[in-house]
Amino acid sequence: YSREIMHDLESRYCTINTGNLVVDAFVSNLLLQAKSLGIALQTDLKFDKDILPINDYHMTIILGNLLDNALNACKNQLNAKIKVSLRSADDNFSIHVANTYVITSPDKAPEDFESTDFIHGYGLKNVKNSAETCGGFCVIQHENDIYSVTVIVPMSS
């Protein structure tokens, strides 16, 4: 009986424990949603929680928008995949979110593909503003049906 309860708890509550509550909450929530939608999710979370150059407010803006956009882009896709990476390396901290996405309108630039459910078009602008406020920058790419956003912030900011 206790095995059944533990299995039930584990299957309902996929938890990430990096030590940063904002990251843990957003990525754990993404895990649950991706699992329920049949979206493959890969995470790479290697950073020191004690020396992040992005405060909780800006981390919430950046992760909230990027993960929401990735999840929305993957809904109703076959073989959908999302990759989330947060890493401290050398002098920089990077957040990289990539997802499968087939562009149906070739005239649009990658910056135009934002979640329609999240304040219609302000998501990526807010991500860019937060990155710049923290002394960093944002790179948006779309190649080979993979849409990705990378935020890089110097560790000294």
Regions found by a protein language model. Give the residues of each.
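Short beta-to-alpha transition helix within the HATPase_c
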Residues: R3-H7, G19-L37
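Conserved short strand/loop->alpha-helix "switch" segment adjacent to the catalytic nucleotide/phosphoryl-transfer site
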Residues: T15, G19, A40-I62
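Conserved ATP-binding N-box helix of the HATPase_c
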Residues: D56-A80, S130
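Short beta-strand/loop element within the Bergerat-fold HATPase_c
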Residues: K81-D91
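Glycine-rich/acidic phosphate-handling loop/turn and adjacent ATP-lid/helix
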Residues: F93-K125
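Glycine-rich nucleotide-binding loop
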Residues: I103, E143-T150
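Conserved glycine-/histidine-rich ATP-lid loop and adjacent helix of the Bergerat-fold HATPase_c
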Residues: N126-G135
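Glycine-rich ATP-binding loops of the HATPase_c
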Residues: C134-D145
